[in-house]
Amino acid sequence: MRRILVLNGPNINMLGTREKAIYGRRDYDSLCAYIRSAAARLGVEGELLQSNYEGDIVTAIQKAYGAFDGIVINPAAFTHYSVAILDALKAVNIPAIEVHISNIHQREEFRHHSVTVAGCIGQICGLGFAGYALALEALAVYEPEA
């Protein structure tokens, strides 16, 4: 059974409260339940972590080395400037997919660029909670080309 680490960055714990027009009314507990259900359906083991602290996310990525087969990451605001998260993703060389609930390319200009995606095999954005399920599904079957 593949093990997938699901990381959520700052303010994702505030789902259901913050900017409902962008993120919807479902809360973080609903997201976690959705992810767990998708993981079970796909036959993968999913472990979830949310942190508002960049260093905690870097540490979680580093600890994933040798323990996880894939990473689903929503770096949230760290997406746009965290070279530390990018470097951690590159260091562990675990297939990772960046996920965003909203479409970052349809929002403010500063959100259009992702620094962290360069450490990922792909990006899914704008599909709400379903983006997490799609990322899990992709990692469940992913085989590196080389």
Annotate each language-model stretch with its function.
Residues K90-R107:
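Short, acidic/small-residue loops that bind anionic groups at enzyme active sites
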Residues H105-A146:
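Short, glycine-/small-residue-rich phosphate/pyrophosphate-handling segment
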Residues A64-I71:
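Short acidic/histidine-rich motifs immediately flanking catalytic phosphotransfer sites
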Residues P10-I12, A76-T79, S102-I104:
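Short glycine-rich anion-binding loops that position phosphate/pyrophosphate groups of nucleotides
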Residues E47-G55:
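Short beta->alpha junction loops
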Residues L15-D29:
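Glycine- and acidic-residue-enriched helix-capping/strand-helix junction motifs
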Residues K63, S82-A91:
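Short Gly/Thr/Asp-enriched flexible loops that form oxyanion-binding sites at enzyme active sites
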Residues M1-I4:
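Extreme N-terminal starter segment of soluble prokaryotic enzymes
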